[in-house]
């Protein structure tokens, strides 16, 4: 085999290997479904763990198993779109004078900013107090702004470490 056909053969083999690798990575990525908490503080028994502050330790695991309730949902399972994406959503709303916290899967346009849920209007006679979309597993159980608070608490410690290092 001469040098030119050998180079063409190797280049073709390289392209096929890359195409297979990209396909395998895409299939792996598509198999991962976003995991979101799914609960409402308005549900009897859920107020102990699904309130404004999510208390995973307060989830009544025996009751959940007995009634076959799944509080963690796979969100991407029903979506196959180039234009939509699954997000985990947490809302706090006032409905007829009662404060209700909900956590669930939601689908938005990929082009929409994550902050859009603060702008959209809820149902009639409902006043939205808080809304947050997030894109990582179980993120709708976290406190709003927890990462910012952690950063604010860590900054003075980082400053002290840097001061002693000099």
UniProtKB/Swiss-Prot annotation:
Q: Which protein, by its recorded name, is this?
A: UPAR/Ly6 domain-containing protein twit
- UniProt lineage: Eukaryota, Metazoa, Ecdysozoa, Arthropoda, Hexapoda
User: Glycosylated residues?
Assistant: 76, 109, 118
Q: Where is the lipid attached (GPI-anchor amidated asparagine)?
A: 140
Example of a GO biological process term = regulation of neurotransmitter secretion
Signal sequence, start to end: 1-24
Cytoplasmic topological domain residue ranges: 162-166
Following inactivation of the gene, the phenotype reported is: Viable and fertile with no gross anatomical or behavioral abnormalities. No reduction in synaptic terminal size, number of active zones or number of synaptic boutons at the neuromuscular junction. Reduced frequency and amplitude of miniature excitatory junction potentials at the neuromuscular junction.
User: Which is a Gene Ontology cellular component entry for this protein?
Assistant: cell projection
Instruction: Report the record's disulfide bonds.
Output: 36-88, 39-50, 75-105, 117-131, 134-139
Write down the CDD domains for this protein, in alphabetical order.
Answer: TFP_LU_ECD_Twit
Transmembrane segments in this chain: where?
141-161
Q: Where in the cell is it found?
A: Cell membrane; Presynaptic cell membrane; Secreted
Additional remark text: The name 'target of wit' comes from the observation that expression of this protein in certain regions of the central nervous system is dependent on the BMP signaling-pathway activated by the receptor protein serine/threonine kinase wit/wishful thinking.
Q: In terms of domain of life, where is this protein from? A: Eukaryota
Stretches of the chain found on the membrane's Extracellular side: 25-140
Specify the propeptide location in this chain: 141-166
Post-translational modification note: GPI-anchored targeting the protein to the cell membrane.
Function of this protein? Answer: May be involved in the exo-endocytic cycle of synaptic vesicles.
Task: Name the gene.
Answer: twit
Q: How does it sit in the membrane?
A: Lipid-anchor; GPI-anchor
What PANTHER family has UniProt attached to this entry?
A: ATILLA, ISOFORM B-RELATED-RELATED (PTHR33562), LD40063P (PTHR33562:SF30)
Q: What keywords does the record list, in alphabetical order? A: Cell membrane, Cell projection, Disulfide bond, Glycoprotein, GPI-anchor, Lipoprotein, Membrane, Secreted, Signal, Synapse, Transmembrane, Transmembrane helix
């Amino acid at each position: 085999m001469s040098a030119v056909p050998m180079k063409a053969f190797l280049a073709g083999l390289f392209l096929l290997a890359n195409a297979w690798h990209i396909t395998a990575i895409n299939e792996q990525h598509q198999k991962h479904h976003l995991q979101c908490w799914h609960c409402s503080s308005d549900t009897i028994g859920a107020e102990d763990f699904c309130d404004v502050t999510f208390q995973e330790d307060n989830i009544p695991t025996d009751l959940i198993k007995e009634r076959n309730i799944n509080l963690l949902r796979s969100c991407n399972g029903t979506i196959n779109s180039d234009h939509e994406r699954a997000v985990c959503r947490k809302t706090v709303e006032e409905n007829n004078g009662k404060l209700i916290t909900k956590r669930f899967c939601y689908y938005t346009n990929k082009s929409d900013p994550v902050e859009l849920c603060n702008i959209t209007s809820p149902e009639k006679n409902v006043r939205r107090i808080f809304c947050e979309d997030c894109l990582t597993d179980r993120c709708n159980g976290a406190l709003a702004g927890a990462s910012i608070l952690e950063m604010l608490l860590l900054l003075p410690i980082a400053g002290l470490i840097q001061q002693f290092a000099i």
